Design a protein with these regions (language model features):
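Carbohydrate-active enzymes and regulators
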Residues: 1-130
Length: 130
């Protein structure tokens, strides 16, 4: 019988104001990111993904020590920034301008704070080939 290999990548999806007010949601994000960094430090083969770029801004502002850890994990290609949205949108109601703005704001933030991300940003925000 052939052995099968299964790859698991940790992910966090948080709707910061669905169940909580803004500050409770922000607290959930910061606690989740700290826990993710702890798990990455504990398990060297683990990878983590997240998709709401505004969560990185919140972390930089309110938990800079966690943000430093995240930046180290991003540089080590163990923390993957995926999706490219500023925050996960409701895709049923917004206009195309809203979607464009989400990507534009995210690209600006990623460019400013993470640079090229070794091509990862292009993969995340759909800017491949630019």
């Amino acid at each position: 019988m052939n052995k099968k290999i299964i790859h698991l990548i940790a992910n966090s999806h948080i709707d910061p104001v669905w169940l909580w007010d803004k500050y409770e949601g922000m607290d959930e994000v910061l606690n989740t990111f700290k826990a993710a960094c702890d798990r990455l430090d504990e398990y060297p083969d683990l990878k983590f993904t997240m998709s709401s770029i505004c969560f990185l801004k919140w972390t930089a502002e309110y938990a800079p020590q966690v943000m430093e850890r995240i930046m180290r994990h991003v540089a080590a290609e163990r923390w993957e920034i995926v999706g490219g949205w500023w925050i996960e949108p409701d895709c049923n109601l917004p206009t195309s301008v809203s979607f464009y703005k989400q990507h534009e704001i995210s690209r600006q933030y990623l460019d400013q704070y993470f640079g090229n991300l070794e091509g990862g940003r292009d993969r995340v925000t759909g800017r491949g080939g630019e």
